[in-house]
Amino acid sequence: MPQCDAYYTHLILILQLKYLIIYDIIHIMKISLETINKFHHARTQAHIDCLNYHAGLLGYHFPEHDNDKHSGTMMTGYAYINYGRYHPEFNIPETHRSLFRQMHKEHHTTQSHHLEHYSDVSEISDITLIEMVCDWFSASFEQRYLTHEDPDDLSVLKWFNTQLRNNPKYKWSQKQIDLICSTIDFLEMYANYDEVIKIWLPLLSM
């Protein structure tokens, strides 16, 4: 009988797994892949436009920012997550969450505007630091005012001071800290909420 019990237990597990796979497929099919990808492209472009709005206040423009997210496996990895962030009722299958984790790590390690790209922050150029700060502003605005993923509602400066400034993992030079803080201060002073929200609003109707 123990063998019989093991057989039925195994069979039940297989049936449960098949059910979950079928459920995920049916649920995904309710939202077309075209809809998910269209939203992802719009959201990614809004992030880039928001970043370049802030960069423009400083006299910069970063046209190549996040270009890797527009095609291939990177796009697939991010598309379902981006759609789910704005549509909480959308059930993201674990397979797509796992792919996102892989692509997120790859993006952060291969793109120079992310700290994970560097073994030593002294390698970061001043222009790339400015792109980083603008990226933080774009991400912060989205998470605080649109997706509400920042429960602490931290400003960029508070986030930098809390997470990065004194983090032993990053050995910032005083020059880098001064550049980061002066850039943050400038953007917090001159960035206009009404102008920035206009960049993101079209997403809310998609």
Spans of features found by a protein language model:
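Short terminal hydrophobic/aromatic SLiMs and anchors at protein ends
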Residues: 1, 7-11, 15, 19-20, ...
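Metal-dependent phosphohydrolase cores
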Residues: 28-206
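Accessible peptide chain termini
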Residues: 1-2, 29
